[in-house]
């Protein structure tokens, strides 16, 4: 009695990782996917490239569409996972990321990219230039 035995061969795909640099300010959101060294650009999209109105550039909706398009472009080029670096304007400007940062991370995940590390790389001043607003600050 000889039964045909089917063996299932697990073919592991080689994972190729990249870095998604997400710059999110209160004026725009830029998603820039590079290789691990950061030297080779794989895909770059911004909120202003996907919406018409200037006021919509920093919105979570624009960030979501830009991230999805960047992810599709990266996956076409063979990227399977990304480490994420989130950046706000920083320095003497705002140190908190804009409204599009979280939406962009979720869109990258939903598009099918594996998410590795999520890191905040906002520049912090070590007593750099004087912030704008004058001696007594911005009075609201």
Curated annotation (Swiss-Prot):
<keyword id="KW-0689">Ribosomal protein</keyword>
<dbReference type="GO" id="GO:0019843">
    <property type="term" value="F:rRNA binding"/>
</dbReference>
<dbReference type="InterPro" id="IPR001971">
    <property type="entry name" value="Ribosomal_uS11"/>
</dbReference>
<keyword id="KW-0687">Ribonucleoprotein</keyword>
<feature type="region of interest" description="Disordered">
    <location>
        <begin position="116"/>
        <end position="140"/>
    </location>
</feature>
<comment type="similarity">
    <text>Belongs to the universal ribosomal protein uS11 family.</text>
</comment>
<dbReference type="GO" id="GO:0006412">
    <property type="term" value="P:translation"/>
</dbReference>
<dbReference type="Pfam" id="PF00411">
    <property type="entry name" value="Ribosomal_S11"/>
</dbReference>
<dbReference type="InterPro" id="IPR019961">
    <property type="entry name" value="Ribosomal_uS11_archaeal"/>
</dbReference>
<dbReference type="GO" id="GO:0003735">
    <property type="term" value="F:structural constituent of ribosome"/>
</dbReference>
<dbReference type="InterPro" id="IPR036967">
    <property type="entry name" value="Ribosomal_uS11_sf"/>
</dbReference>
<comment type="subunit">
    <text>Part of the 30S ribosomal subunit.</text>
</comment>
<protein>
    <recommendedName>
        <fullName>Small ribosomal subunit protein uS11</fullName>
    </recommendedName>
</protein>
<dbReference type="InterPro" id="IPR018102">
    <property type="entry name" value="Ribosomal_uS11_CS"/>
</dbReference>
<dbReference type="GO" id="GO:0022627">
    <property type="term" value="C:cytosolic small ribosomal subunit"/>
</dbReference>
<keyword id="KW-0694">RNA-binding</keyword>
<comment type="function">
    <text>Located on the platform of the 30S subunit.</text>
</comment>
<keyword id="KW-0699">rRNA-binding</keyword>
